[in-house]
């Protein structure tokens, strides 16, 4: 064994298996790229991203931890969102929530 080595089960690992997925169309209406990380409360993302924020409340991107999605100026794309789990209390970010979801 090598320090830090990970032994995973054989076969494909499915992230967030069984969680409901919400797909939203997101458009960057700004003049600069915007990048959103995997665990950012999507409803509180950059105000220049245009999408249904109410549908995104309590959700984050359905992408591997530590990764992000980048939106170039003028770009529009679909993104998969999944609900936060656990106590579902969101603090920080743009400070628009700060309460249980």
Curated annotation (Swiss-Prot):
It comes from the Bacteria. Pathway: Nitrogen metabolism; urea degradation; CO(2) and NH(3) from urea (urease route): step 1/1. It catalyses: urea + 2 H2O + H(+) = hydrogencarbonate + 2 NH4(+). CDD domains: Urease_beta (cd00407). It is an enzyme of class 3 (hydrolase). InterPro entries: Urease_beta-like, Urease_betasu_sf, Urease_subunit. Its EC number is 3.5.1.5. One of its GO terms (biological process) is urea catabolic process. Keywords: Cytoplasm, Hydrolase. The keyword Hydrolase applies. It is found in: Cytoplasm. Gene3D superfamilies: Urease, beta subunit. Pfam families: Urease_beta (PF00699). One of its GO terms (molecular function) is urease activity. One of its GO terms (cellular component) is urease complex. PANTHER family: UREASE. Heterotrimer of UreA (gamma), UreB (beta) and UreC (alpha) subunits. Three heterotrimers associate to form the active enzyme. Belongs to the urease beta subunit family. This is Urease subunit beta.
